[in-house]
């Protein structure tokens, strides 16, 4: 799989991250260096590659300051598979709950989707042509061939005793007799209309594969593995649905693209991508740190830490696509560490996060920058949303400053949730406008400090109300 983004220099990576994330320059520099080191490693000899392991990162800082966003944007820059997991969701081996290896399986699932999406894009035109041909046949059906009764009457168990193997995969309903000249003429007309986009809302009956998740078992990770194995062994069940042509085209294009790509090759490439480029973000790692205040919980927390340790050190994990080596994956741990400290992690785990970065709490000035500087800042998002109703919203600089001050103050007075506070502040302030917007086309609304205070001051100055509403 192509990952040209990995050739970006650390300066380029920081510049790209600055388009979406305000401040936290130290954290950006460290993840940029970690990313560049992956590119440097790819240029080494095979012998040298085996000796160079990624330097895992531990991010320390309160919620809402950009820990997850920095990691997610970094992964997106280079097309690397990325997942975020919470350390508190895992339990020690032998207890009910998710085991730590599930994070690796989830990462491989993401890698498989990335690789297959890229391969599907290469055969998109061919798949769409096949989908259009199929749609023409659905819109102008011909006579179906009679089913072969001998094949349908086969006992599935015969294959175990030397009998013929029933062909579950083939759908005899798709086979048709040679179309008549009249049908050919009609199909030619319909095909032209289809390509011109004249039949997008016409309904067709289509057989689609039923999502295995809809029939799956709920419960432990072992049950999920069993379900995955059963889904691979059993023939895929199809259900008939009536859908518009535009929806049917998407479904059929995806099915034909799946048939056109080599699934086995895609799976192997995905495993390699996960091994060499995978990024696992372990949030709330501070919650499994032990501070010797509650010995009962400490035992369980230490168990989770010890289970995570072999994954970080490098181990072989079985997935439904094959065996995956975690040795060269990049792990980013993150936590607020309000109650515990990084030194409360077991020493072996501390050693697996050699790069430490402390993210700063956000100031009023940071909030102002977050509202205005990013490529698609919150202000720009709300302006664009209301513009769809022909309502023009204009924020003055003073109003933006006032919003930032209120967000900062509410964070100080209640729980500090960082930049996420801006979402609740803006949503509350624009609630009435969003509700009335459809009935006020071509309106121009100026958001001034007075407007902000009218909507928010009574709430922001009342600590009890702000704790519940903002």
UniProtKB/Swiss-Prot annotation:
Gene3D superfamilies: 1.10.8.60, P-loop containing nucleotide triphosphate hydrolases (3.40.50.300). Its main location: cytoplasm. It is found in: Cytoplasm. InterPro entries: AAA+_ATPase, ATP-dep_Clp_protease_ClpX, ATPase_AAA_core, Clp_ATPase_C, HslU, P-loop_NTPase. ATP binds at residues 22, 64-69, 283, 348, 420. The keyword ATP-binding applies. One of its GO terms (biological process) is proteolysis involved in protein catabolic process. The keyword Nucleotide-binding applies. GO terms for molecular function: ATP binding; ATP hydrolysis activity; peptidase activity; proteasome-activating activity. Residues 145-187 are annotated as: Disordered. It comes from the Bacteria. GO terms for cellular component: HslUV protease complex. Keywords: ATP-binding, Chaperone, Cytoplasm, Nucleotide-binding. ATPase subunit of a proteasome-like degradation complex; this subunit has chaperone activity. The binding of ATP and its subsequent hydrolysis by HslU are essential for unfolding of protein substrates subsequently hydrolyzed by HslV. HslU recognizes the N-terminal part of its protein substrates and unfolds these before they are guided to HslV for hydrolysis. A double ring-shaped homohexamer of HslV is capped on each side by a ring-shaped HslU homohexamer. The assembly of the HslU/HslV complex is dependent on binding of ATP. Belongs to the ClpX chaperone family. HslU subfamily. This is ATP-dependent protease ATPase subunit HslU. It comes from Staphylococcus saprophyticus subsp. saprophyticus (strain ATCC 15305 / DSM 20229 / NCIMB 8711 / NCTC 7292 / S-41).
């Amino acid at each position: 799989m192509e990952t040209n983004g990995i050739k970006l220099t650390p300066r380029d990576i920081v510049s790209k991250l600055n388009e979406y994330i305000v401040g936290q320059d130290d954290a950006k520099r460290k993840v940029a260096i970690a990313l560049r080191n992956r590119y440097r490693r790819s240029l080494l000899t095979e012998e040298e590659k085996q000796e160079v392991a990624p330097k895992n990162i531990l991010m320390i800082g309160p919620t809402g300051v950009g820990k997850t966003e920095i990691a997610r944007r970094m992964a997106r820059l280079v097309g690397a598979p990325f997942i975020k997991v919470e350390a508190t969701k895992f339990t020690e081996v032998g207890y009910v709950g998710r085991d730590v290896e599930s994070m690796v399986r989830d990462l491989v699932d993401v890698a498989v989707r990335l690789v297959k999406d890229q391969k599907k894009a290469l055969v998109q035109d061919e798949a769409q042509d096949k989908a259009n041909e199929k749609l023409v046949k659905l819109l102008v059906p011909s006579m179906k061939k009679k089913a072969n009764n001998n094949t349908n009457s086969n006992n599935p168990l015969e294959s175990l005793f030397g009998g013929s193997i029933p062909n579950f995969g083939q759908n005899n309903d798709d086979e048709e007799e040679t179309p008549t000249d009249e049908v050919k003429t009609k199909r030619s007309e319909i095909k032209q209309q289809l390509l011109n986009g004249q039949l997008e809302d016409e309904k067709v009956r289509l057989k689609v594969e039923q999502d295995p998740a809809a029939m799956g078992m709920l419960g432990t990770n072992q049950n999920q593995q069993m379900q995955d194995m059963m889904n691979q062994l059993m023939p895929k069940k199809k259900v008939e649905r009536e859908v518009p042509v535009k929806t049917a085209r998407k479904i059929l294009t995806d099915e034909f693209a799946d048939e056109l790509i080599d699934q086995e090759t895609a799976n192997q490439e995905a495993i390699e991508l996960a091994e060499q480029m995978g990024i696992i973000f372990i949030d709330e790692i501070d919650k499994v740190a032990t501070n010797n205040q509650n010995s009962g919980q400490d035992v369980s927390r230490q168990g989770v830490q010890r289970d995570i340790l072999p994954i970080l050190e490098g181990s072989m994990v079985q997935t439904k696509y094959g065996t995956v080596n975690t040795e060269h994956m990049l792990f980013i741990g993150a936590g607020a560490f309000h109650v515990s400290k990084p030194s409360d992690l077991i020493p072996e785990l501390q050693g697996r996060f050699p790069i430490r970065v402390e993210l700063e709490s956000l100031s009023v000035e940071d909030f102002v920058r977050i509202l205005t500087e990013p490529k698609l800042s919150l202000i720009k998002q709300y302006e664009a949303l209301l513009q769809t109703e022909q309502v023009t919203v204009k924020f003055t600089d003073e109003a933006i400053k006032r919003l930032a001050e209120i967000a900062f103050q509410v964070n100080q007075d209640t729980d500090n949730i960082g930049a996420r506070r801006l979402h609740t502040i803006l949503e509350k302030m624009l609630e009435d406008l969003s509700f009335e917007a459809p009935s006020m086309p071509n309106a121009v609304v100026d958001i001034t400090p007075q407007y902000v205070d009218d909507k928010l001051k009574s709430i922001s100055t009342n600590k009890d109300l702000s704790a519940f509403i903002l």
